[in-house]
């Protein structure tokens, strides 16, 4: 659904409304960090993000707009990632340490680490006792120690 009016996105809402129109906005993990500026929704509707500067957009977030019955739903885009696993928790922890030491964004799951596909990082990982697999998934990295959200 497209509107001719300018749609301004102003805030997060806690619960998905039962009524109203939803625009989907699919973004990468990097794009989800930027809370201000023009974007095109999945149906090519231009919107303007004017969100409070704290925080980050997450997969499934619902945002309110200047139009009372219009909402924007955030969808995390599938990205090229490296999936890192090991039979040894200790090796996985060491690997996470070295990735963090290089300021590489990492998503931590139960038995795997995920990071963005990068040939330099992939070559570094070959020096560890871990298994690496190229995959495509939604990416939600951990907040950094110096994060402002």
Curated annotation (Swiss-Prot):
One Pfam family per UniProt: UreE_C
GO cellular component, one term: cytoplasm
Subcellular location: Cytoplasm
Protein's GO biological process: protein folding; protein-containing complex assembly; urea metabolic process
SMART domains (alphabetical): UreE_N
Chief location of this protein within or outside the cell: cytoplasm
Superkingdom classification of source: Bacteria
Keywords, comma-separated and alphabetical: Chaperone, Cytoplasm, Nickel, Nickel insertion
InterPro entries: UreE, UreE_C_dom, UreE_N, UreE_N_sf
Molecular function, one GO term: unfolded protein binding
Function: Involved in urease metallocenter assembly. Binds nickel. Probably functions as a nickel donor during metallocenter assembly.
Protein family: Belongs to the UreE family.
Protein's UniProt name: Urease accessory protein UreE
Species the sequence originates in: Prochlorococcus marinus (strain MIT 9312)
Protein's gene: ureE
């Amino acid at each position: 659904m497209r509107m001719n009016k300018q749609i301004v996105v102003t805030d997060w809402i806690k619960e998905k409304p039962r009524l109203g129109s939803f625009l989907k906005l699919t973004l990468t993990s990097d794009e989800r960090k930027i809370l201000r500026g023009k974007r095109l929704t999945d149906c090519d509707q231009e919107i303007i993000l004017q969100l409070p500067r704290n925080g980050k957009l997450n997969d499934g977030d619902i945002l309110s707009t200047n139009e009372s019955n219009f909402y924007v739903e955030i969808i995390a885009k599938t990205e090229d990632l490296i999936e890192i696993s090991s039979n040894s928790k200790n090796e996985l922890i060491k690997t996470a340490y070295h990735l963090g030491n290089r300021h590489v964004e990492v998503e931590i799951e139960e038995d795997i680490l995920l990071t963005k596909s990068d040939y330099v990082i992939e070559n570094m990982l070959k020096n560890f006792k871990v298994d690496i697999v190229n995959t495509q998934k939604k990416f939600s990295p951990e907040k950094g120690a110096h994060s402002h959200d």
